[in-house]
Amino acid sequence: MKLALLYFNTITGPEIYFSHPGSIKESICKKILGFFDLDMSDQFFEVSLIEDELKLINLYFEITSCWARGNKEMLMLSVITDKNHKSEIFYDILKEYSIKIMSAVNLYKAFYVKGYLKENDPEIELKINELHTLILECYDKLGERLNINLEDEKIIKKFKKFEW
């Protein structure tokens, strides 16, 4: 499982702002960015990548920004996981962390690192660290949920073997 935070840069278009653990395969990156670039009405959606045997579970949301055109930053949390996992097990955690990101004061500054007139703002580095911490916490919670779900599935399979 991997977790990515996507950001819509109004100058260059969609980009993967942060992923954990490590980077995401180039072919998968292109697909995720393509889905983020679509005009979606649903905030929560999944995409099956049949050839890759993966599933992308996505939650789109926006945060208020004093610096962005239209006063909002467009973001998406994406879980890249095995095709067999149900997207529903991830929803409440993705929602919880989208709310935490939306609620964090001035967190939009984390997206203005290079090439912006505001890059000298002393709060930028603090906000980058705060955002990374939130994403890592989200990843840990998703991992815990996945492990619990896998254990539950093992127990269910054992009980199904019994004849009642």
PLM-predicted stretches and their roles:
Residues 1-13:
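Short N-terminal helix-loop-first-beta-strand/juxtamembrane motif that initiates sensory/input modules
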Residues 11, 16-164:
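Acidic, low-complexity cytosolic segments
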